[in-house]
Amino acid sequence: HSGKWYWEVHALAIDNDRPNLYIGLDEGRVLDHRIINTIGSGAIATSRVYQSNGNGTKTSNNESAYGGTWSDGDVIGVMVDMDAGKVYYRRNNTIESSGAAAFTIDVNTSSFIPSFGVYEDAASADGGNVMTINFGQDSSFAAGLTSVGAQDENGIGDFKYTPPAGYVAFCTKNLPEPQCVPKDNFGIVGYTGTGVNGAAENVITGL
């Protein structure tokens, strides 16, 4: 639970009449396809999201003012500071709400996963929302934009905008090398025998 991580979302099409897009985090232990309940009346308590319709952030059923209303073509940058337990957003390379954190997360008690989706309530139609996520693999967002090739401070990633200082692409290339590797800590044991029951018929060889 450490480090500062960055990824981007291209809001290709926005329909804010309802439903609306959301980008955020959910606790990794929650096995559910939703961040926010799709009927709007019992939102999952572990969700923390930024909404496209101008209603700010949403944590469970509580909304707080933050940022603004998204438009077609906006690129939302997500900045997760696991060291400080805070999450920030940029829209078209401008940080939202004058740099205030969108919400806080408790990194000591929970694990979080990036999550994306549509929030709707019982009165919502299906809408026409489309978004593409870039963890540093393609700044064109599958040919939706002109490729830029911005990288993090480690020279990793292909982003629309350069990640802020200290933030790196949320990908395996930026993870530390594991201290415990199979070749140093595990051995292979082979068993040969005649197929007859009894330990005396089996020969054990370590490789």
What is the predicted function of each stretch?
Residues 1-207:
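PRY/SPRY (B30.2) beta-sandwich protein-interaction domains
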